[in-house]
Amino acid sequence: MKCTVVALVLLVAVQCLVLGAGPAAAAKARRTRQGDYLNRLRGSPSSRASWESLAAVEEQTTTKAAGRPAPVAAAVEAGRKEADRVEALPGHPRGVDFAQYAGYVTVDAAAGRALFYYLAEAVGGNGDKTKPLLLWLNGGPGCSSLGYGAMEELGPFRVMSDGKTLYSNPYSWNHAANVLFLESPAGVGYSYSNTTADYGRSGDNGTAEDAYQFLDNWLERFPEYKGREFYITGESYAGHYVPQLAHAILRHASPDINLKGIMIGNAVINDWTDSKGMYDFFWTHALISDETADGISKNCNFTAYGAGVASNALCDAASDEVGESLADIDIYNIYAPNCQSEKLVTPPIAPSIDNFDPCTDYYVEAYLNRPDVQKALHANVTRLDHPWSACSDVLTRWVDSAKTVLPIIQELMKNSIRVWVYSGDTDGRVPVTSSRLSVNQLQLPVAAKWRPWFSSTKGAGEVGGYIVQYKGDLSLVTVRGAGHEVPSYQPRRALVLVQNFLAGKALPDCKECEQD
């Protein structure tokens, strides 16, 4: 199989690596991961806007998405909140001291398009009015924020190896905020459309507009969150979703949505720097040979203007060599073990919140396909013709994917929206080198120079990663020892990260360490 990265975004490049994996990798239980889907879905070139032109981005985002009919507004959602209350999830642990809600919000009544959400209110109950509302989005495109975000990363529970029992996550983000997880677009997870043609015309623009419509309708159901400080966070291809939704909020100028900041992790931001940074990471982490790295450097055109250059045989050959070198490791955390079996284990293995189980995807898939779980979540009410899956097999085409979101990030900063870009430093999928190169394209002056931050200040302290702050309220943060899904691998450090992001504070230094 021949794949090249010069004409496609980083996501497509790594899809080539995944599909080109050798027989040894195929014999393992391979996780379907965020970012593996764009090559399969993609049906059109990247959006044409160069990053220097915000006007081009404005033109794209205000154009009707992918020829899809204009959405028809749904009925006002007031009064539905109590019907969405989750009394208890099957297999839940003791001591649940926060409210949960889940259900559907219609975003297009004519198409019958509805998005599924799960809300874990802040610990302590009653949706603590002192804590903000935080929306979490996973990427893909086409991967579930319920399955990944809520059940494997930052949610209040994780699933044990029997696929039936939940255990508590002491570092869940609802210690810091009321956390809303959205499965988007329609066709992902439990979300659906009664117009099946919608599954073939998904894309960046339509996803942002549907997510905005979801928020607008959801706030009618939960009016206590109107005007509450609101933050959007996410990872991977949510590097597109998050700023694009924030941009839609600015354009619609809703008085009910008090957007304060966005935070994106191991995020797809800018095609050519994402791709260059990925191959730089492979070489600097001894994953590919000098010869392969030279072949990539000499024959693959990683520049802002080279991203659309036609494929060439020498670049293809070097890309194939990369795929062979990476076939037997987990590119999403290059130091993590692979899952060796997708079978459930009963009685369950004693879980460890600090040692992420690489087979967790299979436990979550089993749990979310249980009828009693779906009933508790008010999910699958239309009896979908497919099982719940972490990443959608229902979406058939992705019709627009921006080459860059840097101009949108610039626009958000001009509107005093806080922006944090964070990166787990063991991810090879959208690595820290990509994030650094992409942020550097903004050419921002440094406000506070690169330094370590500390996830613990006891004794000699514990370095959680590194941070550099730029003028205009943008911070670039690394998380030490974390892969693509940062809260999965470093949950404590991820909680410190989000707490300080929400507070608008710099991450802790260690000036007081020896006094503790």
Swiss-Prot record:
It catalyses: Preferential release of a C-terminal arginine or lysine residue. GO terms for biological process: proteolysis. It comes from the Eukaryota. Residues 1-20 form the signal peptide. Residues 21-77, 342-352 form a propeptide. The keyword Amino-acid biosynthesis does not apply. It is an enzyme of class 3 (hydrolase). Disulfide bonds join C143-C391, C300-C315, C339-C359. Its EC number is 3.4.16.6. The linker peptide is endoproteolytically excised during enzyme maturation. Glycans are attached at N194, N205, N301, N380. One of its GO terms (molecular function) is serine-type carboxypeptidase activity. The active site is at S236, D427, H484. Keywords: Carboxypeptidase, Disulfide bond, Glycoprotein, Hydrolase, Protease, Signal, Zymogen. GO terms for cellular component: vacuole. PROSITE patterns: CARBOXYPEPT_SER_HIS, CARBOXYPEPT_SER_SER. Carboxypeptidase II is a dimer, where each monomer is composed of two chains linked by a disulfide bond. Belongs to the peptidase S10 family. This is Serine carboxypeptidase II-3. It comes from Hordeum vulgare (Barley).
